[in-house]
Swiss-Prot record:
Keywords: Glycosidase, Hydrolase, Magnesium, Metal-binding, Sodium. Na(+) binds at D207, F608, N611. Its EC number is 3.2.1.23. GO terms for cellular component: beta-galactosidase complex. It comes from Klebsiella pneumoniae. This is Beta-galactosidase. Belongs to the glycosyl hydrolase 2 family. It comes from the Bacteria. It holds the Pfam family Glyco_hydro_2_C.
Amino acid sequence: MQISDTGRSHTPDFHAVLAREDWHNQTITHLNRLPAHPVFASWRDELAARDNLPSSRRRQLDGSGSSLTPAARLPSMRVVTQDLPDCRGTPVPSNWQMEGYDAPIYTNVRYPIDTTPPRVPEDNPTGCYSLHFTVEDTWRENGQTQIIFDGVNSAFHLWCNGVWVGYSQDSRLPAAFDLSPFLRPGDNRLCVMVMRWSAGSWLEDQDMWRMSGIFRSVWLLNKPQQRLCDVQLTPALDALYRDGTLQVQATIEATEAALAGLSVGVSLWRGEEQFAAGRQPLGTPTVDERGHYAERVDFSLAVATPAHWSAETPNCYRAVVTLWRGDELLEAEAWDIGFRRIEIADGLLRLNGKPLLIRGVNRHEHHHLRGQVVTEADMVQDILLMKQNNFNAVRCSHYPNAPRWYELCNRYGLYVVDEANIETHGMVPMNRLSDDPAWLPAFSARVTRMVQSNRNHPCIIIWSLGNESGGGGNHEALYHWLKRNDPSRPVQYEGGGADTTATDIICPMYARVERDQPIPAVPKWGIKKWISLPGEQRPLILCEYAHAMGNSLGNFADYWQAFREYPRLQGGFIWDWADQAIRKTFADGSVGWAYGGDFGDKPNDRQFCMNGLVFPDRTPHPSLVEAKHAQQYFQFTLLSTSPLRVRIISEYLFRPTDNEVVRWQVQAAGEPLYHGDLTLALPPEGSDEITLLDSLILPEGARAVWLTLEVTQPQATAWSEAEHRVAWQQFPLPAPLGCRRPPCLPALPDLIVSDEVWQIRAGSQCWTIDRRTGLLSRWSVGGQEQLLTPLRDQFIRAPLDNDIGVSEVERIDPNAWVERWRSAGLYDLEAHCVQCDAQRLANETLVDCRWHYLRGEEVVIVSHWRMHFTADGTLRLAVDGERAETLPPLPRVGLHFQVADQQAPVSWLGLGPHENYPDRRSSACFARWEQPLAAMTTPYIFPTENGLRCDTQALDWGRWHISGHFHFSVQPWSTRQLMETDHWHKMQAEDGVWITLDGLHMGVGGDDSWTPSVLPQWLLSQTRWQYEVSLRSL
C-alpha cells in the first residue's frame, strides 16, 4: 500500500459527526478504520520476534484507569474533551451492564428492539469511555501509532484529544485506527462513544446475552514509517503429505519513493533451530497490461519433511517476517504456523490425507461474573477441559473470537470453525437481509475482515459464513469470494437448508439419526438418509446437535454409533459448551445464577441460555462424561470370555500410543476378582488383540460379573495431569449357574389388628399400615421412627427443560411432554385405596393393597402393592399396575418416601458414579460406588429432575438397605419443591432426605429441546408394569 506525504484532511466537528447518524446506516461499516490484518507486535529484533518476547512497540491499555459516562441517549459534546461529573471509573475491558449500568438482555431468536432495519431506537443507551495514556517521543516523531480495539459492542465513534478519528461497527473483529496525527506530548485522552444499538445489531441476533461496551482488550501499536501492513502465510503439503512449502504474501505501506530498496525476509523456526529462510525485494511479477504490485512481494520457501500440525500433534513453527532497507532491519512480525493440508476428497473432509472425525462443541464467549469479557486464563481453562473430555474441535459460535483464542488453539491443538459475525434469526423471513443487496457491504466486511485477520492460524480448518440467516445472494457472493481468496480451506454454511451451493459440507443443525423432519422449504433429513440422497457427495458434519440444556444429552451414543458406521458422517458440534448464566445478588439478598428475565429484560427467553455441558463456572454437568465416553479415541471389543480376550482399536489418526496404559479388572457384585495392566503400543489407527486371562474361573455363586477396561496416560501432558483417564468400557460376563439357598428365618412376624391399622412386629421392627389409605405410614426400629412420610407411588418427575420445550405461560405448546401430562391430569390425580388386606403366610406376613388414581371420576391408574414382611426385618415389595390408554406415556413408575437425614455416604451397586438415565448411561459403569450425599444431586440452575442412578441392585445409606433391580435417587429435595422453584439457589432445606426408587423411568431426550425428543424405545409406552424391591432399616 502506498501512502502520500500530504497531511490529514479536515475532520468534522462533534455535531457534524452525530448528524450523519452512521449507526443507522448499514452501508457505513466504518470510517477511517485501517484495513484488517493479522495481529502485529512490530518487533525491532528478529530473535525477539522468534521467541515471542514482549514487544516495546505494543502496549496494552487494559485496566481500571478508564472512566465511563453513561447516557440513555447521545451525550453532549463536552464528553469529547472532558470527563463529566457523572462519569465513573470503569475497567476496560468490561460490559457496562456488568458494571451497574443498563440491563443485560437475553433473547434467542427475537430481536431485543423493534425490527426496523437499518434504523435502531432513538433511545439508544450510549457510553462514553475516557482513556488516558502517554507515549514516548519516538512514537510521536517516527512511524505510525495505531489504536486497536479487539472488540466493542456494537458501534463506536472515536476522538483523540478532542479531534474525531473515525467510526466502526462489527462488535467481534478488531478495529484499528491511525492516531499519529492526533498525539501530543504528555497526557493523551481518548473518547470512545459506544452505542448499544447500531445497524450492525441487525446482523448480531445470536442466541446470547445482549451486552455493550469495550469488552475486549485495547492496544497501542507503534509501526515504523515503512512497515508491514499485511502478511498472508500459507503453509502447504505436497500430494504425498511429505514435503512442504510456505507461501508468503506481504504488503508494505510506504511512500512511493521509499519502496525502492526495501525487501522482505522470512525465516522458519522450531525453538532455536532454523528450518528455512529467504529474502526477496519488493514487487510482484506482472499481473496484467498495467503492470505489477510495487508494494507487495510473493514468494515461497521449500521445507523438507516438516512435522505436521493436527489437533493430536499440534506441531507449530514460528514464522518470522522481516522488512529490510538494505541490511537495516526495519521491523519484524511473527506468527505460529502449522503444516497441514485440508481438503475434501472422495466425499470426506480430510486432514493430511486422513478422514477427520469431528468431536466438536459450540462455544460462546461467556463468563458468569464478567459477561462477555473472557481472559486468557478463561480460554485456557476451556481448552484444557475440552481436550480432557476428548473434544478435538470447536465452532466459534457465532462470531470471531478474541485473537488470543486462536493462538492458544494452535498451540494446544483444537480444530476451529471460524464463523462470521452474521445472524439474522429474528427476521421474517430469515433471509430478508441475506438476499438484500443493500446489505452486501455489511455482510462482505464481516466475512472478508475475518479472513484477513485470522487466516494465518493453522487451527482454523473451516470458514463459516455465519449462522441462521437464511440463504441469499449475499452469502452466495461471499462463498465465491472465499473460495477464490482462500482455496486452502472449505466453507460451510447452514442457512437456507444446510446443503445449498454455498457450503462445501452438509452442515445441518439438530438433524436426527433416523427420523426425517420435513420442514417446509428447508427439510432436515435423517443424517443416514441425507448422505445417500441422489447426487449428494459431500461430507456431513452437524454444525449443532445434542442440545445439552439442563438434564439432557439422551440418545447421544446413537449419533456416535452412526458416525463410526458411516464414513461420510464425520461428527458434529454439540450445542453448547457452557451455561450462559450470570452471577447476581437478587432483591431478597440471595446470590445465585440469573437467566433471561432476571434483570427485568424484555423480551427474554428465560432459561434457554443454559444449554451447556458445564455450569457457568465450568463445573461439569454429568452429560460431559457421556460426551467424553462417546467421543473417546479407543474402541473395545470383547472377543471371548475364556480365554478372556479383547480387541483395542486406536482412533488417533496421527499419533501412536506413546503414553497409554490399559488397566483392566473383573468384578463380581462390585468385588474385584482379577486385575492387571499393560502398556499400549499402537500405531495411528492401529489395533491389537490382547489376552487378559488364559482361563476365566469364577467362584461359585458369583453374580453381576463385569469386565472393566480403561486407558490412562501415566505421564502428564500439555493439557492433562498424570494418570488422566482417556477411555473406558465395560462388558458383562456370564456368571456361573448356581442355586441360592432360601434363608432360614425365625418365627413369623406378629400381625396386630385394629380398626384403623395393621401392625406387624418382628423383633425390634414395627411396621404400621393405615387400613383406610393403605399406606405404610410408620416404620420404627427399636422405638425410633424411620419414616418422615409414608411410602407412596410416584408417577411424575420435576419437568426437564426437554419436557417443557418451548411451552411458556403465555405460549402453550400442546405437544410438550409437560403439557401432555398436565392436560391428562397427571399432576392432580387423587389416590383412593380400594383394597387393604392382611394375612399371615408360611414364612411371612402379607399386606395386599390396591389404589385407584382418579382424574375426576375416571380411574386412569391402578397400582397394586404386595408388601411381604419377614421376621428378619425385611420388607419385600412387589408392585404391579396399569394405566389407561388415554394417558400419555408416564415420566416414571416408582415410589418415594422421606426419611431422617444421616451423616453417612451413599453406597450402591449399580451404574455410576455420576448421574445417569436410561438413554444417557453409556458412560456409567456397573460397580460398587460410594459418594457423599451432596454428590447425589445435580444442582441444575433451573431446578428439574436430577440425580438418578440406573440399573441398581443394592443401595445402602446409613441404616437403610435396599435391594432388587431399580433406579434410584437420594437427595434432600422433594419432587414438589423441584417443580415449584425456578432457580436452584432458592431451594430450601427440608426436614429430611427423599429416597426415590423407580422400576421404570422415561429417557431425558436431547436431540433438541423444543420438540419431544425422547426416542420411542425410551418412552414408557407400555400400559402394564411390575417391579420388586426389598427394604431393610437397621
